[in-house]
Structures are given as structure tokens and as C-alpha cells.
């Protein structure tokens, strides 16, 4: 009798610890970027501040994400967002140019067979005139 109870207990423990197999799923979370500039018309050589937020319903997409300030399709600066998705760039403007901020997307909690991704986004363009 003692042997049967021991075998039953061992079987129950084995089943409880093994758990159900993981189910594969995708989570593709959209993002969007805002941008504001401190001054749209400056003297050549003046500094301006570009700031905004990376927005998403999923906090993991907003927090600690790499965003890039782009001018003439070239990356001029890179920053990590704050826990709430905020970013700020301070740049010297030497000539009139159009700027935008880009987020390339990222993978989150990459554990096979799950696919969790924050989708890429970019802000609207802002033109800063330097005279």
C-alpha cells in the first residue's frame, strides 16, 4: 500500500511540474512618434531642441527604445527613450533643413516560439530655417 501511494504521489508531482506545452503566438504592437521643435527659425549656429514621445499601448515598446534624429535621410543623433517614451535631442543648426525622428522597431521577450515585436514608426517632418 505504501508503495502505491509513493508511486501515485511521484506521478502527480511529475505531471504538475511538466506543465502544458507553450502555445506559439504573435504580438505585433503599433507605435507612433511625436515631434516638437523649440524654434523653427533660428540664426545659423543656434541650438534647437527636438523633443517628443514614442507612443504605444504596450509599455515595453515605449520604454528604453532607440530613436534616431534624421536630417536629409542621414542619422544625426541617437537616443534611448525614457520609461514613459520621452526623448530629447539638442542640435546646432548650421543650415535650413528638414528633420524627423525614426524608431526602427524592436523584438521584445524573444522566447521561441513567441514573436513579440514593436513595429517601426516615424514622426512627421519639421523644417528649421537657419538665416
Predicted regions span which residues?
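Cytosolic terminal low-complexity segments enriched in Ser/Thr and acidic residues
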Residues: 39-42, 110-112, 129
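Local beta-strand/beta-hairpin segments that build beta-sheet-rich folds
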Residues: 76-78
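Enriched for extracellular/lumenal, surface-exposed ectodomains of secreted and cell-surface proteins
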Residues: 95-124
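Beta-strand-rich domain onsets/edges
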Residues: 23-49, 53-55
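Short flexible loop/turn segments that cap and initiate beta-strands
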Residues: 59-74
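Extracellular interdomain linker/stem segments of modular secreted and single-pass surface proteins
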Residues: 29-31, 125, 129-131
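Secretory targeting and sorting signals
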Residues: 1-24
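Glycine-centered loop-to-beta-strand initiation motif
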Residues: 80-91
Amino acid at each position: 500500500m505504501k508503495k502505491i501511494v509513493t508511486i501515485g504521489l511521484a506521478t502527480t508531482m511529475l505531471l504538475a511540474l511538466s506543465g502544458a506545452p507553450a502555445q506559439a503566438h504573435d504580438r505585433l504592437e503599433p507605435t507612433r512618434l511625436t515631434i516638437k521643435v523649440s524654434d523653427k527659425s533660428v540664426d545659423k549656429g543656434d541650438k534647437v531642441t527636438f523633443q517628443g514621445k514614442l507612443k504605444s499601448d504596450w509599455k515595453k515598446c515605449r520604454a528604453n527604445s532607440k530613436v534616431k534624429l534624421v536630417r536629409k535621410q542621414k542619422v544625426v543623433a541617437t537616443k534611448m527613450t525614457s520609461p514613459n517614451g520621452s526623448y530629447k535631442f539638442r542640435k546646432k543648426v548650421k543650415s535650413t533643413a528638414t528633420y524627423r525622428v525614426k524608431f526602427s522597431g524592436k523584438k521584445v521577450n524573444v522566447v521561441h516560439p513567441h514573436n513579440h515585436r514593436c513595429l517601426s514608426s516615424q514622426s512627421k517632418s519639421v523644417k528649421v530655417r537657419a538665416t
